[in-house]
């Protein structure tokens, strides 16, 4: 079919949420002429749910996005109202940063960044169809009949695909925050042959700040110690005038109100059909599932400096409006609170992610990529991470360059994508530290050491960032080498000082690095014995040194595991393999292999329902040029 295109682009990104923004910035910065199409320009990088960025595992993803040259970290560092490091009482593997955002300022700043980006056109328009010829993308069709040519298309439509808002018995077609739903595009994706699922998420009511009795709640301040998401942010710019959050709880009265109105709850009346998020359940779901709990935490989170809206975190609901009012007024501190917005549920279509490659390109259609909630994930951070990788790979494909696949040992982003494409998801997917088997090497503090060189190689890390990274890496390497070269001997003068500090004396000579492995010895104490570094070290370098030294044994074990898995990841499986030709593998394994079509032995080994015997048979088959027999 011959198309009359009115405009031509290298890459078209559909949807300007957190995934779409990262995808379009990546492609344009890598030199591709890019169109970012959105239903509503005023909702670019909008936060329709929680006014925050980061959190457990998610905060590390934001650091990874920044290390690769993405935008989310820099943008939140310019627009936060509170910053807090989580899990400081636990080990370094689970520490993560979380920021309360000024949500309107966050969106405005990101829009400004997009508007001034070279090679990037921002357009308010609705895309109805993705145009495909001979199994590859050639462009898109707008609702107004315009055809735009493209060599690659990235779908980042969030919850807009056939979106429906549900509030009590009210149900209507809508995207998030009462924006337009994208129904025709949802139909088009199904017609193209993609398998579609249906998920649900929700959001809590917003209440008026001046109507809250804060005396009845517990203050939750931010941190005094400077922290940032972007490796380029300076401690001197750390916000001193932070806005606190507040903690309150549900109570028995709250639970009674919910229980008495369960028959009116869309989740229980049958109105809601989509699968909801396991790790962010509605309050009515929590009351039913955890009936033995006397109360549930609720955090009151300001949505910005210049708004009265306060987000009631933990109270996600689609109960009728009158029930929501009664529920709010049953909570300590909210007895007289004014509800400014009701909570609601939203159902939406997703592309089942087992149909994707690890590049986030669909297996079915060449040049078609999907990212974010379109792939069944929840959360701004998960969306942004996918958007960045989809954008990078769309640009690399257009340019005829080698693709980028982040492994599970490279990044949390790699863990997430591997989970999605290998295991799929039956519910909105959320990243957790427990999903990462190599979490000790996927830390908040070393994201730049892991990923900045990759970002530089693909063209997203500019000269300023690269120079700063090289300085940091050299300082780290030099100081680690110095600490490993200086010996502390168990002489009287040294041991007298050690004992004065209340520590056990040395019995053998050891390096300063070995001395630092003692739990009680930090960097400051170590250098008081061996002298300071040749140049002043940033606090973040010192933190990195302490972690790498104290956990060296565990880190080495993890790296050994990575090396073993790497050998499996390097064993490729032909794309045209005939799974029916492999004798003796279990029926379940054969079915899963056909569905997922894994690209490596490593990926095949992680598929649910596949056992080691199946992998052994597969490897024998591949090594024997297509012949596999069970050995007895």
Curated annotation (Swiss-Prot):
Domain of life: Bacteria
A GO cellular component annotation in the UniProt record: cytosol
Residues given in the record as NAD(+) binding sites: 276-290
Residues the entry annotates as binding FAD: 15-20, 127, 182, 373
Keyword tRNA processing part of the UniProt annotation: yes
Signal sequence annotation: none
One GO MF term: flavin adenine dinucleotide binding
PROSITE patterns: GIDA_1, GIDA_2
InterPro entries listed in its UniProt record: FAD/NAD-bd_sf, GIDA_C_N, MnmG, MnmG-rel, MnmG-rel_CS, MnmG_C, MnmG_C_subdom, MnmG_C_subdom_sf
Chief site of localization: cytoplasm
Cofactor(s) required, per the database record: FAD
Localization in the cell: Cytoplasm
Nucleus in keyword set: no
Protein keywords: Cytoplasm, FAD, Flavoprotein, NAD, tRNA processing
GO biological process, any: tRNA wobble uridine modification
Family note: Belongs to the MnmG family.
PANTHER family listed in its UniProt record: GLUCOSE INHIBITED DIVISION PROTEIN A, PROTEIN MTO1 HOMOLOG, MITOCHONDRIAL
Chain's role: NAD-binding protein involved in the addition of a carboxymethylaminomethyl (cmnm) group at the wobble position (U34) of certain tRNAs, forming tRNA-cmnm(5)s(2)U34.
Subunit structure: Homodimer. Heterotetramer of two MnmE and two MnmG subunits.
The name this protein goes by in its record: tRNA uridine 5-carboxymethylaminomethyl modification enzyme MnmG
Natural source organism: Streptococcus pyogenes serotype M3 (strain ATCC BAA-595 / MGAS315)
Upper classification of the organism: Bacteria, Bacillati, Bacillota, Bacilli, Lactobacillales
């Amino acid at each position: 079919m011959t198309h009359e295109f009115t405009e031509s682009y290298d890459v078209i990104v559909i949807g300007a949420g957190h995934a779409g923004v990262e995808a379009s910035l990546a492609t344009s910065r890598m030199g591709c002429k890019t169109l970012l199409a959105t239903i509503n320009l005023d909702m670019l990088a909008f936060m329709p749910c929680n006014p925050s960025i980061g959190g457990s595992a998610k905060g590390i993803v934001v650091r990874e996005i920044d290390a690769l040259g993405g935008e989310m970290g820099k943008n939140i560092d310019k627009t936060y109202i509170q910053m807090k490091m989580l899990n400081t009482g636990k080990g370094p593997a689970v520490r993560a940063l979380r920021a309360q955002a000024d949500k309107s300022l966050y969106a405005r700043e990101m829009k400004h960044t997009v508007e001034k980006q070279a090679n990037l056109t921002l357009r308010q328009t609705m895309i109805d169809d993705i145009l495909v010829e001979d199994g590859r993308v050639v462009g898109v069709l707008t609702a107004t009949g315009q055809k735009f040519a493209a060599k690659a298309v990235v779908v980042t439509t969030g919850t807009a695909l056939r979106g429906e808002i549900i509030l009590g018995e009210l149900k209507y077609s809508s995207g998030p925050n009462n924006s337009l739903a994208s129904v025709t595009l949802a139909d088009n994706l199904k017609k193209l042959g993609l398998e579609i699922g249906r998920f649900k998420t929700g959001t809590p009511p917003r209440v008026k700040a001046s109507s809250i009795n804060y005396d009845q709640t517990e203050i939750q301040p931010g941190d005094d110690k400077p922290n940032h998401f972007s490796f380029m942010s300076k401690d001197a710019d750390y916000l001193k005038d932070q806005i606190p959050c507040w903690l309150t709880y549900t109570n028995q009265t709250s639970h009674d109100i919910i229980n008495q109105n369960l028959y009116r709850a869309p989740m229980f009346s049958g109105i809601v059909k989509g699968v909801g998020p396991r790790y962010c359940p509605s309050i009515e779901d929590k009351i039913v599932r955890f009936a033995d709990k006397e109360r549930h935490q609720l955090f009151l989170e300001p949505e910005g400096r210049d708004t009265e809206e306060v987000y009631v975190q933990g109270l996600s609901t689609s109960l009728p409006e009158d029930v929501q009012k009664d529920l709010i007024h049953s909570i300590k501190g909210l007895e007289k609170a004014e509800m400014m917005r009701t909570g609601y549920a939203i159902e939406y279509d997703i592309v089942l992610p087992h149909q994707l490659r690890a590049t986030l390109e669909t297996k079915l259609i060449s040049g078609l990529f999907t990212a974010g909630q379109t792939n069944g994930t929840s959360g701004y951070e998960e969306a942004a991470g996918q958007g960045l990788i989809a954008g990078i790979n769309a640009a690399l494909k257009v340019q005829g360059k080698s693709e980028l696949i982040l492994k599970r040992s490279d990044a949390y982003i790699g863990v997430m994508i591997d989970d999605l494409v290998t295991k799929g998801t039956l519910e909105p997917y959320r990243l957790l530290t427990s999903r990462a088997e190599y979490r000790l090497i996927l830390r908040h503090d070393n994201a730049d050491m892991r990923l900045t060189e990759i970002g530089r190689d693909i063209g997203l890390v500019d000269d300023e960032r690269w120079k700063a990274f090289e300085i940091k890496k050299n300082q780290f390497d030099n100081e680690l080498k110095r600490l490993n070269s200086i010996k502390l001997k168990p002489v009287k003068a040294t041991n007298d000082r050690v004992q004065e500090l209340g520590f056990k004396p040395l019995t053998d000579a050891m390096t300063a690095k070995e001395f630092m492995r003692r739990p009680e010895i930090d960097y400051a104490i170590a250098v008081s014995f061996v002298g300071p570094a040749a140049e002043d070290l940033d606090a973040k370098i010192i933190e990195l040194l302490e972690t790498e030294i104290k956990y060296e044994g565990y880190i080495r074990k993890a790296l050994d595991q990575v090396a073993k898995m790497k050998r499996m990841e390097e064993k490729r499986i032909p794309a045209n393999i005939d799974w029916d030709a492999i004798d003796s593998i279990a029926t379940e394994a054969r079915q899963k292999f056909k569905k997922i079509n894994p690209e490596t032995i490593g990926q095949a080994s992680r598929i649910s329902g596949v056992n080691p015997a199946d992998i052994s048979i597969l490897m024998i088959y591949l090594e024997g040029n297509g012949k596999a027999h069970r050995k007895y």
